[in-house]
Structure formats: C-alpha cells, structure tokens
Regions:
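A residue-level marker of the well-folded mature domains of exported/periplasmic proteins
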Residues: 4, 20-224
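Positively charged n-region of N-terminal signal peptides that target proteins for export
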Residues: 1-7
C-alpha cells in the first residue's frame, strides 16, 4: 500500500509542475486490473486521488484505465495518446511489452511517471519503486540463517519484470555466499496463488527433499 501512496504523491508533484504552464491538464493513469488485494489497493488509491484533485481543480482531467493483460494495457496507452494527454502515470502490467509504447509516449514529449514494476529502458521522467534488491537480500539472509546455512530450496518467482529480476538476482547473489544451500528450481508463478500452488505441487513430486521455499510476492496476499 505504501507504493500506492507514493503514486498519489507523484501525481501531486506532477500536477504542481504543470499548473504554471498549462490552463488545462490531461493526465492518463494506466494500471493493472484489481484482480487481488494489492492491485485492489492501487485502484482504490488512484480513484481517491483523482476524486480529490478534480474537486480542487476542475481544469485537471484524469483518464483512469485498467488492464488485465499487457496487450490490453498497450492498447489503453495508445487510446490515452489519442486523447491528447499531457502526462502518463503507469504501473506496467509487464515490463518488456510495455516499454516500446511508453518510449513512444516519452518521445512525444509527454511527461511519464513509471511506478513499481518498471520498464526495460529509462524512458520515464520519474520512477517510483521500493527497495526491491533489498527485499531479495534480506529474505536470502533470513532463509540461510533459518536453514543453518545448508539445505535444498525452491523458488516461486513473480511476473518476469524489472522488480522480479531485481529481487531474484539479489536473492541469488546472497545465496552464492552459502555453497551448501542449493536452489533446486526457480520458476515464474506470475504472482498468482493458484499458479504458485500448481508449481509447488510439481516441485514436491519432482524432488525427494525440499527444505524451504522462497516466494517472490507482491504484497500481503497468502503464499502458496
């Protein structure tokens, strides 16, 4: 939820910067569909921020769109460009598929704020995210200590995107310090409880002994 609050703050700063140069401001906000608790919070805070700003300044127009897939989000951003937006706030559904369209927005001179999952190229003016490498390092050190620095583990990754890579890479880097800890398998569960459950069941059938499992999670949803 802290990232949602940061998103509201970024929009606030963005509006302030435009207020001196444009009588009418159009801001597009593109985020994933509220398909679980964390994205539900993102949607709620985005709607709240929009309502509050429009009550204070009728010259600010927001276009909030949600997408259940990268393809839908690309189409949404294209539609926002047609609407003539001055700025785009985007939480990418997936980093790689969204980078080209966001780069197009950026090259058109539209102010871009990227939130959380990031893009594969620096094609934003502002990037807001948590300490994802830190999350990977802390979880790796904790797990190593709990295992007494030896054992076999499996990993459930998130969606293949920038923040997932940052967390997993940092986790793996710490693991190198402990050669007696072996990573048996690491697969993307796409931050889905159901998908994670399926992969974990396969892990349990495939490997004779698993001492621990690492889940790269989005927020506070239950791990498989």
């Amino acid at each position: 939820m802290k990232k949602a609050l940061l998103m509201v703050l970024v929009v606030t700063l963005l509006l302030s910067s435009f207020a001196f140069s444009a009588p009418k401001i159009r801001i597009g906000v593109s985020i994933p569909t509220a398909d679980h608790g964390w994205t539900g919070g993102i949607n709620w805070w985005a709607q709240k921020a929009i309502k509050e700003w429009q009550a204070k300044d009728p010259d600010v127009t927001f276009f909030l769109v949600t997408a259940d897939s990268p393809a839908k989000q690309v189409a949404d951003v294209e539609d926002l460009m047609v609407k003539g937006i001055d700025a785009l706030v985007i939480l990418a559904h997936d980093s790689a598929p969204l980078t080209p369209i966001v780069e197009k927005v950026y090259n058109e001179g539209i102010f871009v704020v990227s939130v959380d999952r990031g893009l594969t190229k620096p094609v934003e003016h502002v990037y807001v995210a948590g300490d994802n490498p830190g999350l990977g390092r802390v979880s790796a050190e904790w797990m190593a200590k709990e295992l007494n620095y030896k054992g076999s583990i499996v990993v459930l990754e998130g969606i293949p995107c920038v923040i997932n890579s940052e967390r997993v890479d940092a986790f793996n880097e710490v693991k190198k310090k402990y050669p007696n800890i072996k990573i048996l398998d690491s697969q993307p569960a796409y931050w889905s409880t159901q998908k994670g459950l399926e992969i974990m069941e396969n892990y349990l059938q495939k490997y004779d002994k698993i001492d621990a499992g690492k889940a790269v999670r989005r927020g506070r949803e239950p791990a498989p």
